[in-house]
UniProtKB/Swiss-Prot annotation:
NCBIfam families reported for this sequence: LutB/LldF family L-lactate oxidation iron-sulfur protein (TIGR00273)
InterPro entries the record matches: 4Fe4S_Fe-S-bd (IPR017896), 4Fe4S_Fe_S_CS (IPR017900), FTHF_cligase-like_sf (IPR024185), Helical_ferredxn (IPR009051), LUD_dom (IPR003741), LutB (IPR022825), LutB/LldF (IPR004452), LutB_C (IPR024569)
SUPFAM superfamilies linked: alpha-helical ferredoxin (SSF46548), NagB/RpiA/CoA transferase-like (SSF100950)
PROSITE patterns: 4FE4S_FER_1
GO molecular function, one term: metal ion binding
Function: Is involved in L-lactate degradation and allows cells to grow with lactate as the sole carbon source. Has probably a role as an electron transporter during oxidation of L-lactate.
Protein name per the record: Lactate utilization protein B
Gene that this sequence comes from: lutB
Length: 473
């Protein structure tokens, strides 16, 4: 899988999402639950805004000194016996991982959940050279079996219910039991455990890399990443170049923010800090590789969008977004969905494929308020819109003409007065009662799904004149 998950046009993807009543119900329920849990966890911590400010400060400091911390990380990983590779492009990253697999003559690879490995199409690259790649995260495993893309950053199978999952397991894996979650989880556990033991290579992502120790931090709810890191003889960790922290002290702050913002917990079930195996350690990989991926991030770092790199992938913005609530994750056409996806995806994938995403927002600002590291997401969405209009001339000719006419009318008192007088008569063939009828010309996309009030026959100026102090009415 790559970052792009659909070839459909944006409007078609949105239409599919709106028509999927189960998905919208599941997303609404999950958003409400995660939002409530996040507020409770934040309240328990106390002075949440101060923690957010500290998180923002840490992320900004790290990005401002990213070259220093990346070199420090590389030196310390190398000192501990690991190998570090800096990949400028996603193709370079995938090729390096292919080369490691070829060198090890690997046939089976097991991996934990990782957005950046999907971004670089790692699974496809390994399958090209004959490797079987197994997802060990339960949600990702379900989607892999069903050949379905993720719809949420931390809950990839959010759009499926247990009956659908049971049917997938029955059709693809021969599962014969009920749709009870416990039974299905037990079935998957047996499937995965057997393959864990046979895998030659384990691949993980990286929530944070600690510069001064050469360590990686992984945060999971299932413990699958621990097995990926400890059973296979070779481990490959893949990280976006921005996922750095200077020391364990900063890591402590960001993990606390991540867990509370993502799922409303003080800590997830498993927080693991590890790296290349040391002489005194009894388990872990014999060989360790760290792949640091740029893939456009250095360009973002030097642009007006650099604040998006503060993201810690908690999905708090996704869990409060009203647009995501109604259209779901697949509508974004990218592995990165929600407000963070609408900002990040056009930067990584370009405006040609993703120029609609910055407009998939009501600009309500809920995402900015929810972000634990204070990324001004709605401001960045507006910046995208500005760039698109200036560079791409996105607006259709009819829209440009309509806006030009409105600008002329709104800036002239005489024209505005004349227009307000003519509007009721001009719209009368299209009105029913006090509302505009459905399917009216260029207003169709609005009037088909929302009530559009008909122009009032009484102008405000006339009403005010009659009702001002001393008036008769």
């Amino acid at each position: 899988m790559s970052m792009k998950i659909s070839e459909k046009k944006f409007n078609d993807r949105v239409g599919d999402g709106i028509q999927d009543s189960f998905m919208r119900g599941a997303v609404s329920s999950a958003q409400t639950r995660l939002y409530t849990n996040r507020l409770k966890a934040a309240d328990e911590l106390g002075n949440w805004e101060e923690w957010r400010e500290l998180g923002e400060e840490i992320r900004q400091h790290t990005l401002e000194n990213l070259d220093y911390y990346l070199m420090q990380l590389s030196e310390n990983v190398s000192k501990r016996g690991g190998h570090v590779y800096f990949a400028k492009t996603k193709e370079e990253a995938a090729k390096y991982i292919q080369d490691v697999a070829k060198k090890k003559q690997a046939k089976k690879v097991v991996k934990s959940k990782s957005m950046v490995t999907e971004e670089i199409s790692m699974n496809h690259a390994l399958e090209e050279i004959g490797c079987e790649v197994l997802e060990s995260d339960l949600g990702e495993y379900i989607l892999q079996v069903d050949n379905d893309p993720p719809s949420h950053i931390i809950a990839p199978a959010l759009h499926k219910n247990r009956t659908q999952i049971r049917n997938v397991f029955k059709e693809k894996l021969g599962y014969e039991n009920s749709d009870d979650p416990y039974e299905m989880t037990k079935f998957v556990r047996k499937q995965l455990r057997e393959k864990f033991m046979d895998a030659e290579i384990g691949v993980t992502g990286c929530n944070f890399a600690v510069a001064n120790t050469g360590s990686l931090c992984l945060v999971t709810n299932e413990g699958n990443a621990d097995l990926v890191m400890s059973i296979p003889k070779t481990q490959i960790a893949v990280m976006g170049m921005e996922r750095m922290v200077p020391t364990m002290e900063e890591l402590d702050v960001l993990v606390g923010l991540l867990c509370r913002s993502a799922v409303g917990q003080k800590l997830t079930s498993y927080v693991t800090v590890a790296g290349p195996i040391q002489e005194e350690e009894v388990d872990g990989p014999e060989e360790f590789h760290l792949v640091v991926v740029d893939n456009g991030r250095s360009q973002i770092l030097g642009s007006e969008f650099r604040q998006v790199l503060q993201c810690i992938r908690c999905a708090a913005c996704v869990n409060v977004c009203p647009v995501y609530r109604h259209v779901g994750g697949h509508s974004y056409g990218s592995i990165y969905s929600g407000p963070i996806g609408a900002v990040l995806t056009p930067l990584l994938g370009g405006y040609n494929d993703y120029k609609e995403l910055p407009y998939a927002s009501s600009l309500c600002g809920a995402c900015t308020e929810a972000c634990p590291v204070k990324i001004p997401l709605h401001d960045l969405l507006l910046k995208h819109r500005q760039v698109i209009v200036e560079q791409e001339g996105r607006a259709p000719l009819a829209e440009k003409l309509a806006m030009k006419m409105f600008s002329m009318g709104a800036s002239s008192a005489a024209l505005y007065k004349m227009g307000s007088k003519m509007a009721p008569a001009a719209m009368s063939p299209f009105t029913s009662g006090n509302r505009v009828s459905k399917g009216v010309g260029p207003l169709k996309n609005w009037t088909d799904i929302r009530e559009f009030p008909a122009p009032s026959k009484e102008r405000f100026r006339d009403w005010y004149k009659d009702h001002k102090k001393g008036g008769d009415k």
